[in-house]
Swiss-Prot record:
One of its GO terms (cellular component) is transcription regulator complex. This is Transcription factor Sox-19b. Keywords: Activator, Developmental protein, DNA-binding, Nucleus, Phosphoprotein, Transcription, Transcription regulation. It comes from Danio rerio (Zebrafish). The modification Phosphoserine is found at residue 159. The gene is sox19b. It is found in: Nucleus. The keyword S-adenosyl-L-methionine does not apply. Residues 1-10 have a biased composition (Basic and acidic residues). Its main location: nucleus. Residues 52-120 bind DNA. One of its GO terms (biological process) is chromatin remodeling. Residues 1-35, 209-248 are annotated as: Disordered. Residues 209-229 have a biased composition (Low complexity). InterPro entries: HMG_box_dom, HMG_box_dom_sf, SOX_fam, SRY-related_HMG-box_TF-like.
Length: 292
């Protein structure tokens, strides 16, 4: 059994000696060979030229050392602010001071063209520009342009909802004028119903009686504005009193009058004779002085 295991280990040993660790390069391979391997390591569906960076220009060559120096002096400064300051300093340099950096940029460009002869600069699209193009105004119904367009369309053709509420082409003022013109006729009906009230009621005050007398005595037709205001005190009173209730009202009035008339043994005939005078005092808004 041990002999079989030793035989298997001997057969499996030589292939391991031929393999190399991933961190070490095989013998005879240089830097150029490693560079070739990195170029072919891209996935098959991706263009290897997309991973290649542009050659640095003169400003990038100069700012490479200046940026590091400024970042060490101002650790809390943002990178965008550093770029602004470096750009302002680069513009202040003279052509003589820029010359060595320009020559270095030309050399780097020549090396780049030699290493990547098929390279073409392809600027990447900005994500913000794509978002604006992918979201046109038509996708949002509440945009300002769509609201203006819908308002113009409703102004030309009219809206069925607004027409149903009386705000169409004619406007809502026509209905209001018609309602205002219909108020005088309703006031006539109130005047006729006011004539059916009994002559005196125990809960009637001088203000309501005065308003009824002014309505019934006015011969001319009131204006629409006055007709909209005056029917309000009449809306709180009943529209009419049946004839069989008049006797009850008169009996209650006699009982109330008999409390103030001296001599409680007077007959009903004397109360009836005193009733018209007291009724006149109540209608006039004055209190009878017979009990004094």
């Amino acid at each position: 059994m041990y002999s079989m295991m030793e035989h298997e280990l001997k057969t499996a040993g030589p292939p391991h000696t031929l393999q190399h660790s991933p961190g070490m390069s095989p013998p005879g391979s240089g830097v150029g060979n490693a560079h070739h391997v990195s170029k072919t390591a891209c996935p098959p569906g991706v263009d290897p030229m997309d991973k290649v960076k542009r050659p640095m220009n003169a400003f990038m060559v100069w700012s490479r050392g200046q940026r590091r120096k400024m970042a060490q002096e101002n650790p809390k400064m943002h990178n965008s602010e550093i770029s602004k300051r470096l750009g302002a300093e680069w513009k202040l340099l003279t052509d003589v001071e820029k010359r060595p950096f320009i020559d270095e940029a030309k050399r780097l460009r020549a090396v780049h063209m030699k290493e990547y002869p098929d390279y073409k600069y392809k600027p990447r699209r900005k994500t913000k520009a794509l978002m604006k193009k992918d979201n046109p105004v038509g996708k949002y119904p509440l945009a300002a342009g769509n609201l203006l367009a819908s308002a113009v369309a409703q102004g030309q053709g009219g809206s069925p909802r607004m027409d149903g509420y009386g705000w169409g082409h004619a406007g809502g003022y026509m209905g209001m004028q018609g309602d205002a013109l219909g108020y005088p006729q309703q006031l006539h009906r109130y005047d006729l119903s006011a004539l059916q009230y009994p002559a005196a009621q125990p809960y009637m005050n001088s203000a309501s009686s005065y308003s009824q007398m002014s309505y019934s005595s006015s011969p001319q037709q009131p204006s629409p504005v006055m007709s909209m205001v005056k029917p309000e005190p009449l809306s709180h009173s009943p529209t009419g009193v049946p004839n069989h209730h008049r006797g009850a009202f008169q009996g209650d009035l006699r009982d109330m009058i008999s409390m103030y008339i001296p001599g409680g043994d007077t007959s009903e005939s004397s109360n009836q004779r005193a009733y018209p005078g007291v009724q006149q005092h109540y209608l006039g808004g004055t209190v009878p002085l017979t009990h004094i």
